[in-house]
Amino acid sequence: MATNNGDVLMLEATPEAARPWASAANAEVIDALPYIDDDYGNPLIKSEVDRLVEEEMRRSSKKPADFLKDLPPLPKFDFKNCPVLGKEYERVRAGKPPVRIDFESRYKLEMPPANKRNDDAAWKQYLQKNQRSLQQKLIELENLELMSKLGPELWRQNNHRLEVFLTRMQRLAQEQNEEIEKVNRERKYHQQTTSYELNALSQEWRQLCVKNMEIQSACAMLETQIDSFKKEAAERGWNLEEKLENVEPLQMQ
């Protein structure tokens, strides 16, 4: 059955080949008509449906806790044998306190040891080392000044980028929600328009079931009568098979 423009109704169309999350050979197909199935409001039917759903969930291979099982496994991290954390593990096992970071020594001028105070080469070496340290501190001060001067503007620009990104994500989420709502409206429309045909077919099926039961009952009565006639004929000594062979078949008018 198709519409006037040739579109096939959703419930009657052949399902398209979708790309499942996991292409399992025993993937379960779940079908439902939530927009036209109103029998769930009946308490008796509701209890029976709940029982069937619970039974199906017990037999189902798709358990709620197994949804992530279809995804690739996470990489294994061996934190226990990590060389970076090895010393910390040893310190914790030994019950030692964490090593205190000495910030004061970074800002102190180093001097040659006492036994090299009269060595010009040692003084030149430590002088160069202190000059490099001083140059590093000057660079750090310049970076702090730049951060103090330009940092607020950079934060504002970063916040603006985050706001633009948030707006874009919200727009995409809204578009997806609109697509979901569109699909739900189409499903509702197709289910409601197809419900008339389904109801007619259900009514026809029930009538055929009643007719079949009536035919089956009539056939059972005829079989009982035939058995009764055969029994009566046997008691009277009649050979029904011989008599039936001599009867000419009825001609169709």
Swiss-Prot record:
<dbReference type="GO" id="GO:0005681">
    <property type="term" value="C:spliceosomal complex"/>
</dbReference>
<comment type="similarity">
    <text>Belongs to the SPF27 family.</text>
</comment>
<comment type="subunit">
    <text>Component of the multiprotein assembly MOS4-associated complex (MAC) at least composed of MOS4, CDC5 and PRL1. Interacts with CYCL1-1 and CDC5. Associated with the spliceosome. Interacts with ENY2.</text>
</comment>
<dbReference type="GO" id="GO:0006397">
    <property type="term" value="P:mRNA processing"/>
</dbReference>
<dbReference type="GO" id="GO:0008380">
    <property type="term" value="P:RNA splicing"/>
</dbReference>
<keyword id="KW-0611">Plant defense</keyword>
<comment type="function">
    <text>Component of the MAC complex that probably regulates defense responses through transcriptional control and thereby is essential for plant innate immunity. Involved in mRNA splicing.</text>
</comment>
<dbReference type="GO" id="GO:0042742">
    <property type="term" value="P:defense response to bacterium"/>
</dbReference>
<dbReference type="GO" id="GO:0005829">
    <property type="term" value="C:cytosol"/>
</dbReference>
<keyword id="KW-0539">Nucleus</keyword>
<feature type="coiled-coil region">
    <location>
        <begin position="124"/>
        <end position="235"/>
    </location>
</feature>
<keyword id="KW-0175">Coiled coil</keyword>
<keyword id="KW-0747">Spliceosome</keyword>
<keyword id="KW-0391">Immunity</keyword>
<keyword id="KW-0399">Innate immunity</keyword>
<dbReference type="GO" id="GO:0005634">
    <property type="term" value="C:nucleus"/>
</dbReference>
<dbReference type="GO" id="GO:0045087">
    <property type="term" value="P:innate immune response"/>
</dbReference>
<dbReference type="InterPro" id="IPR008409">
    <property type="entry name" value="SPF27"/>
</dbReference>
<dbReference type="GO" id="GO:0050832">
    <property type="term" value="P:defense response to fungus"/>
</dbReference>
<protein>
    <recommendedName>
        <fullName>Pre-mRNA-splicing factor SPF27 homolog</fullName>
    </recommendedName>
</protein>
<dbReference type="Pfam" id="PF05700">
    <property type="entry name" value="BCAS2"/>
</dbReference>
<dbReference type="GO" id="GO:0005730">
    <property type="term" value="C:nucleolus"/>
</dbReference>
<keyword id="KW-0508">mRNA splicing</keyword>
<keyword id="KW-0507">mRNA processing</keyword>
